[in-house]
Structure formats: C-alpha cells, structure tokens
C-alpha cells in the first residue's frame, strides 16, 4: 500500500471538495426556476389555474396601460386593466379606494378584497385578520357591491356570501403575489380614499 504525503492528501481533499461544490451548484442550479429573458411576462395564468378553486371567474386582461383618466372596467369590482400610474398601498381601509389605484396594486400581485359597506363589524374583523402578515392584501368597502364580499386579483375574481368561506383563503394563497409585475412592492403607495357620495 502506498501512502501519499500529507500535502497531496490535502490537495486531493480540496479538489474533491471543490468538485463536490461545483457538482452541488450544478444540481441546485438545475432545480432552480429558469432565468427569464429581459421583458418576459412572468405572470402565468396557467399556474393560477392548476387546481381550480370552485367559483373563481377568470378574465383575459386586454391592457395594463397607465392612465390618469377614470376607467370603466368590464368587471365590477375590476380584476385588472388600465390603471393609474400610482398604486394603492396594500392595507385595510375603512373607506372606498379608487379602483384605478387598486388595479395597479393588482398588477403588483395584490388581492383586493372588497366588501359591502354595511358588512357586520365581526366580519370586517375577520378580513382584517387575514391581512396580518400578508403583504399583498388590499381590503376596502365597495359601495354598490352585489355580493357581501368579492376577492379580485389580476384576471380573476371570487364572489362570496361569507367571509369565513374557505375558498377566500385559498384564493389569497393562489393569487397573492401572482400578478404581471410579480415581486413589485405593495407595502408602499398611495393611501388615499374616496368619498362615497
């Protein structure tokens, strides 16, 4: 049996270690998400529809243009479309917010939960609790809402009769952070509200 000098053993261990790290890095890199080309659309509706949530309506969003003009949206409340250059900060509001600002937040990945202004306080408290530790949730009253609660995201909407419906949390889990500008902030932005009358 031939023994190698200690210096050779150390060099071999170092080479094996580097080789292992290189191999591990290659394996990890292969498991990572693919790198997107600059300008690629990172919002993939197919991912959002992988396991359908009963009652979710999906929409093809025609435009994401910025405008300072009021927008008439095909859905009420809106689920994407042209929007104000300023996004609404994701938070819980006691008064309605401008849809054009909320839609910009949806583009960043926000789920906008709207509710009837006369929703009981106990139900509003449940909605407020949902917003804890969820940076992509925007909650506000919405005058004229046809359902007690509606959750809207970019290209998707869920109408609900009850804030405790488990589909609401499933919708948030599915769509929060999944907008065309995924990764854009929602914890800053405008905080203005509008008058109901």
Predicted regions and their residues:
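Helix-rich interaction surfaces within compact, conserved domain-sized segments
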Residues: 126-129, 133-197
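Surface-exposed, low-hydrophobicity interaction/linker segments
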Residues: 40-103
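Intrinsically disordered, low-complexity Ser/Thr/Pro-rich tracts
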Residues: 1-59, 169-197
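Solvent-exposed coil/turn segments that connect beta secondary-structure elements
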Residues: 76-78, 116-118, 144, 154-157
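Mid-length scaffold segments of soluble, non-membrane domains
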Residues: 85-86, 91-132, 137-138
